[in-house]
Amino acid sequence: MYILVWKKGQQIKTFHTLDEAAQFKAASNIDEAQMFSVTVASAISASGGSTEATNLRRLMYLSKSTNPEECNPQFLAEMARVAFIRNREIRVSGFLMYSSPFFIQVIVETDEDLDFLFAKISADPRHEMCIVLANGPGTGRMYGDWHMKDSHLDSITTHTAMKTILYQIARSFSSMWIYLQKSAANMLMLGKDPAAQPPERRSVVVTFIYLVEFCSIFSHPNLTEKTADVLSTFVYVCVKNVEGSGGNIAKFIPAICMTYWPIIRTKEALTAIQQISEDLAQLRSQQAQGSAVSLRYSQAGVHYGRGMQCNAGSRKSDFTLLGDCINTTSRIATLAKKLKTPLLFGFEVRCLLGDEKREEIEGAGIHQVKGRDKPVVVYQFPGPDLDVAMVRQKIEQFTPGRFRCQMPVVEYEALPISQRPPIFDDTPKSNPRPRTPGYGGRQRSDSLVDRLIRIANLSGFSESATGDTTLTTLTYISQATRPMSRLDLSAIMPTATRRNAQQSNIGTVLHENGLFVQTLEGPKDAVVNLYLRIRQDPRHTDVTTVHMAPLQERVYTSEWTLTLATEEMLATFPPVQDVLSQLAKSYTSLETYVPSTVVRYLTAGNNPRNLMPVSCGVVMLATDISSFTSLTEISSFTEVWMICNTFIDACTSAICQEGGEVIKLIGDCVTPYFPGNNADLAVAAAQELFIFCRQLREAFVDVLDVRGCVSCAVGMDYGQVVMAQCGLLRLSDYVAAGAVSAGVVEVEAITREVGYQFVVTVPDADRVQPQFRDYGIEPTPQAIGGLPCYGIVREVFDLPVESIKRGIKAMHAARSGEQPLTEPEQAKPDFRVSPGRDRHGVSGRRSNSSQGKGSIQVG
């Protein structure tokens, strides 16, 4: 059974199937509505006893008060009294706790009643932003006959530590939740760690929705400051129509929305994309003169295929779809631009449509696209063309008039240092780190640890109160590596107290059920140095920073050199243990999915919604696995996931180690950026990645493992980007958008054609530092946006695509027991290039390593 709730919970209707609910919603033109699945089970077991205990479900949620000033203990008690009377009638149990400005509530009830009750609770105007922390089966009623036990945190404890810890974790968690992809959020709600889930095969309809000519909008001198407005409205329209039709937003790539639907909703997918185009047209017609919103048009490509939903990466993660169907969809969307159509879809999508819908479509021809040996058959709906040249001309003729945008973009360098968003980690390094990335390891790195290590290296591990003495607070959470007894906890205190007294640090540490939560206060250098020591303690792992910010005055009294908070503190209200544990566990998982800039801004005590849109110059990389399509054709889904996970982990490790920021993970493609004045860091990260791939091949080539065929290519470009927050309260993203975002992917794509593993553009060649001048560069026949490109010339940087493909085929033949290839040179996966080999498309040219001349030196 399905329940449809709208009009803020006042209108409710039940349906037997999801399609019935969706059809009613569409026919009634209901925009703001929620659907809930309800499982109806018998209340009497076969033996005649009650089955309530086995049908119970436990839901914990976090929300924010709309009027924190009135939420005193008396107000909360009245809320609980009314809830108690209502819940006793329907046999609901649980508790409600308030820690300004957050409500935390747990409800235990049978499946058929819980969704209905939560729908009404979500519509209550006294709170907003209801985020489910846990939603799973319960083994019984944990809170007995508490039909609604209430407590204001002030009534639970006067302990400052508990109030501070709960507030900081709840604030950080609620702020980061909106950046989480829906599928990963559902995992967390069920109490599962997305990173620990095995890959799941799915048949999906994938779409790429493009904002037409965004690069032209960005490049126009009168439109750069309006870029954030354009992106934000585009995201809003996409989210409204995709999620409203049963689809899922996979991710936002600058000016591109990647989405997917289950195959039973193919018709809804096409309808939603058409509605996005119509909504943008309506918005264009309503805009005042000089509004950049009048320049927004959308184009989309749709394709059906088998994909794999899984977690990719560990240091920076993405719960995403993998599979060749993703790449094909992107190519079809690009083809839509050439064919001047707003919506283009493949033959497989046409087969999923009903007879009525098929009569409306028309063929758009057979076309060859990149990455596929066979051509694709595409279709479109009849209608007016969408001429990209017309849109470009409209942009070029744009005059701003007197219209003022809501989120003006400002120059990053023009802002005072204190007002600049933390898009770079500008702390200088005292000692160069080794050029080989570290992979794996016991300790999980959080998003602040690199900055903290650099600060510590500059200041030294001095026990004196020298250096930066700014009063600072830092809160972290971690998990114990083994059970901790009272004796173990007591043994921590004397050493910690003595050490903290020497460094003027005070604070508290809470241990409950394997969870450590510690807050430190003191001079900044002393707090940072202590935190770095604590991270190395083998008694805990998964150390994650929750909050780090300057203080005006100490929260804890001077007598608290270190206070241990345990069960005694929570004895008056045991459910706090449950709340704290669930919040900390979810936060640890959530932090890896959120952009690093947002995490840094948030942990400094700021609201990410206040991040100012800025424009700046960056060096950007794009890298992916060479011949990935060929690899996927001979690999199982599990092997594809393993290859991507291994490669993405290597990329993020190398990039973060060199001071770069990972923007997006798109299938097997990783796109980071580096400071515009430090291209050598990007080159160093690329070197580390090449070394990793070579070592990986050498390790697995003799055991017929697909990892023995992994090679990669890197493109590097320089340009201006706008970094801005865009989206809604329920789904948001922090993007780096600009012409370079798309251009660097094109630079990387030509590596296959020219036979170089590393290709750069002219601006990047000018920015590379002297230590890389021993690498000559050679012009390529292709140019990107009028800019010539150059390949880095060394034999180890050659990319023999045909040799890689032969190696993949040879490995597949060996694994399947087929006869080896007849040509000896084809039987062995050779990833090196013999001196003198002619490159594809570079007739007559040879590498600098073989000729010793004819190259351009970097510098």
Curated annotation (Swiss-Prot):
CDD domains recorded: CHD
Q: Which compartments does it reside in?
A: Cell projection, Cilium, Flagellum
User: What's the domain of life for this entry?
Assistant: Eukaryota
Q: Among the record's GO biological process terms, what is one?
A: cyclic nucleotide biosynthetic process
Q: Which UniProt keywords apply?
A: Cell projection, Cilium, Flagellum, Repeat
> Compositional bias of type Polar residues: which residue ranges?
845-859
Q: Which residues form the BLUF domain?
A: 56-149, 471-563
Question: Which Gene Ontology terms of cellular component type are present?
Answer: motile cilium
What InterPro entries does its record include?
Answer: A/G_cyclase (IPR001054), Acylphosphatase-like_dom_sf (IPR036046), Adenylyl/Guanylyl_Cyclase_3/4 (IPR050697), BLUF_domain (IPR007024), Nucleotide_cyclase (IPR029787)
Please provide an example of a Pfam family that matches this protein in its UniProt record. Answer: BLUF
Which residue windows does the record flag with biased composition (Basic and acidic residues)?
825-841
Kindly indicate whether the keyword Iron belongs to this entry. Answer: no
Residues of the region (Disordered) are 420-444, 814-859
Gene Ontology MF terms:
blue light photoreceptor activity; FAD binding
Q: Which PANTHER family match?
A: ADENYLATE CYCLASE, TERMINAL-DIFFERENTIATION SPECIFIC, ADENYLATE CYCLASE, TERMINAL-DIFFERENTIATION SPECIFIC-RELATED
Q: What else is known?
A: The ST- strain is deficient in phototaxis. It is not known if this is due to defective adenylate cyclase activity or defective BLUF domains in this protein. In wild-type E.gracilis, photoactivated adenylate cyclase is found in the paraxonemal bodies (PABs). PABs are absent from this strain.
Quaternary structure and partners: Heterotetramer of two alpha and two beta subunits.
Tell me what this protein is called: Photoactivated adenylate cyclase subunit beta-like protein ST-
Underlying gene: pacB
